[in-house]
């Protein structure tokens, strides 16, 4: 009889844990939906502003402040990283990244960088590219902040001006290198809202063998695949060029299950698969959780 009581008690506890996890997942998905709605002009933000794109200085500033407010809701402090980059022999580019540091709970000088760009191309709402990446980054920041044990520090960064040649990430990679941060790995997110075939697979771009193995492991545990590609067209490339272990994370860009609305006026809020975004957020979080708690 005692054994049966114990079994029932365990079942009750596990059921409550599962229900709590599902509730948290639904709550986070709702927040991610709201973030993308604001970034894409589907709803008003700031002083009743409607973003048609995130291309010019004014729209990027509004988007940056909007994301800063969301991150600060998690209790984190946002810092600005203004930069000036030589774009060509006759032109310099100015922009501003924003970042936050989630400190380790134990003494550590190691850092993991999580990043996503917040700008879009001109005349595109940029829902999939890359409001989805920003929403995933927010979700990761919120979940990591809630961890009781963190054996590594986390830097959460929103990059400016990816769409003109990954300029913001280039500036941030140089900033981190000049500061001599001991960086374990860099994980950048770009386009995470399309899954027409509903297989929930993700792609990992140019991962190191160690990062490849851990992403594949956690994907397999969830019954999906993390497919390796050699894509170099997003922010991870700037960190690789600076000598860091970096990986890009995206939907099936090379495996032909990616948004048909890329860099167009039809890359709108209503084209985003929020269930897929939520699932992929959980997958990437599982990877990061293992990396910072082991």
Q: Where are these predicted regions, by residue range?
A:
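Active-site-adjacent substrate-binding region
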Residues: 197-294
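N-terminal capping segment at the start of a domain
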Residues: 22-61, 119-120, 189, 257-268, ...
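Solvent-exposed loop/turn segments at secondary-structure junctions
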Residues: 84-88, 105-107, 118-122, 161-165, ...
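Acidic/histidine-rich catalytic neighborhood of metal-dependent amide-processing enzymes
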Residues: 94-95, 120-222, 226-228, 236
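A non-catalytic alpha/beta surface segment that caps or lines the substrate-entry region
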Residues: 41-103
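Extracytoplasmic/secreted proteins, especially bacterial periplasmic and envelope-associated proteins
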Residues: 27-38, 58-78, 132-139, 143, ...
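Bacterial N-terminal signal peptides
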Residues: 7-16
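Structural recognition of the beta-strand scaffold that forms the well-ordered cores
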Residues: 38, 79-80, 97-101, 111-115, ...
């Amino acid at each position: 009889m005692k054994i049966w009581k114990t079994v029932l008690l365990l079942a009750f506890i596990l059921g409550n844990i599962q229900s709590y996890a599902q509730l948290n997942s639904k709550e986070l998905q709702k927040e991610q939906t709201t973030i993308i709605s604001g970034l894409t002009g589907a709803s008003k933000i700031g002083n009743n502003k409607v973003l048609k794109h995130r291309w010019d200085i004014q729209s990027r500033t509004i988007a940056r402040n909007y994301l800063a407010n969301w991150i600060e809701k998690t209790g984190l402090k946002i810092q600005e990283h203004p930069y000036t980059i030589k774009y060509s022999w006759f032109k310099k580019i100015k922009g501003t990244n924003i970042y936050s540091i989630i400190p380790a709970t134990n003494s550590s000088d190691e850092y993991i960088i999580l990043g996503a760009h917040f700008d879009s191309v001109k005349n595109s709402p940029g829902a999939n590219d890359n409001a989805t990446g920003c929403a995933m980054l927010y979700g990761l920041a919120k979940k990591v902040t809630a961890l009781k044990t963190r054996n590594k520090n986390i830097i959460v960064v929103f990059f400016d001006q990816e769409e003109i040649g990954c300029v913001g990430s280039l500036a941030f990679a140089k900033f981190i290198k000049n500061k001599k941060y001991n960086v374990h790995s860099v994980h950048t997110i770009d386009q995470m809202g399309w899954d027409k075939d509903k297989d929930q697979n993700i792609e990992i771009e140019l991962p190191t063998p160690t990062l490849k193995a851990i992403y594949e492991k956690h994907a397999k545990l969830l019954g999906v695949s993390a497919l390796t590609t050699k894509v170099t067209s997003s922010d991870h490339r700037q960190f690789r060029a600076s000598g860091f272990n970096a990986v890009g994370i995206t939907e099936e860009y090379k495996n032909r299950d990616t948004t048909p609305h890329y860099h167009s006026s039809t890359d709108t809020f209503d084209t985003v698969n929020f269930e897929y975004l939520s699932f992929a957020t959980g997958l990437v979080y599982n990877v990061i959780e293992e990396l910072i708690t082991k």
